[in-house]
């Protein structure tokens, strides 16, 4: 049996399962059976932007194609992202960032995985850069919003949902190169405002890195030895709207198309 290493996305999915916001059947399909889920339009745009910036294919190996008009021109949203590519190039040039590798696959951690968008030399330091695209660059309330105020409380679940990637990749870099707390940056680009982009440098408490390593160990044991062994009925967390759009919908025996009855006690 081939065991699954824990990526930061799988770690978040397991947490969502714990709080009943994600179906276990979908997690098994994506991370154990490696079934492909169709990307949303927002994900497609993000994949295209990252491909144009780094020249690295998405994990499905398919070259992203932009939306085009009948005359062959880019659609309006993609024209905004084309302008953002110019902003990205300006950032690289004006900050004197030397890109060493793109799409770097970390291998040396025995139980954790991750693929860095960019490994670079910045001010004579090896750094990790991750590219994000968002329609909510100044929104602190949206799950994928990047409003500055969101990070005033770094321990909040909403902030950690975004920053856990930095924690994971810093840990991976320690195993990979022996670098303690490697500098990590998010480059965030708006999909709605072609002139809006942000750079966040993420500083991580060393104690948190140690705790994260233990969390990876626990998640690895749980996923590989317990989670995937559960029955379909134990894994399923059906929810009407979620089931309706799930890529497993056609053959799933646990799906629902009417709401579950919930009891209110007064």
Where are these regions (language model features)?
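Secondary-structure boundary elements
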Residues: 93-95, 120-128, 173-182
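Metal-dependent nuclease catalytic regions and adjoining charged, substrate-binding loops involved
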Residues: 39, 75, 156-163, 168-266
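Short intrinsically disordered terminal tails
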Residues: 1, 125, 265-266
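A short, sequence-level motif marking secondary-structure junctions
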Residues: 11, 19-21, 134-135, 204-210
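Non-catalytic protein-protein interaction segments used by genome-maintenance enzymes to assemble
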Residues: 101-163
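Hydrophobic/aromatic-lined pockets within catalytic cores
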Residues: 53-57, 133-136, 174-178, 224
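Metal-dependent nuclease catalytic cores that hydrolyze phosphodiester bonds in DNA/RNA
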Residues: 1-116, 120
């Amino acid at each position: 049996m081939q065991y699954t290493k824990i990526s930061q996305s799988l770690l978040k999915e397991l947490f969502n399962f714990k709080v009943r916001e994600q179906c276990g059947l979908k997690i098994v399909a994506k991370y154990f059976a490696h079934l492909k889920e169709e990307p949303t339009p927002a994900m497609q745009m993000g994949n295209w932007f990252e491909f144009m910036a780094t020249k690295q294919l998405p994990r499905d190996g398919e070259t992203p194609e932009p939306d085009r008009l009948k005359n062959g021109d880019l659609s309006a949203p993609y024209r905004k992202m084309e302008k953002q590519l110019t902003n990205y190039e300006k950032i690289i040039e004006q900050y004197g960032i030397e890109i060493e590798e793109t799409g770097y696959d970390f291998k040396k951690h025995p139980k954790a995985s991750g693929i860095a968008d960019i490994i670079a030399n910045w001010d004579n330091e090896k750094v990790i850069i991750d590219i994000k695209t968002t329609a909510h660059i100044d929104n602190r309330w949206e799950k994928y919003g990047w409003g500055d105020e969101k990070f005033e409380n770094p321990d909040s679940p909403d902030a950690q949902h975004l920053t856990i990637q930095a924690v994971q990749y810093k840990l991976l870099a320690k195993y990979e190169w022996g670098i303690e707390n490697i500098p990590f940056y998010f480059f965030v680009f708006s999909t709605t405002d072609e002139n809006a982009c942000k750079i966040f440098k993420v500083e991580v408490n060393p104690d948190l890195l140690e705790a994260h390593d233990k969390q990876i160990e626990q998640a690895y044991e749980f996923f590989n030895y317990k989670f995937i062994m559960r029955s379909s009925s134990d894994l399923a967390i059906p929810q009407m709207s979620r089931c309706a759009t799930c890529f497993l919908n056609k053959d799933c025996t646990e799906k629902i198309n009417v709401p579950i009855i919930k009891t209110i006690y007064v």
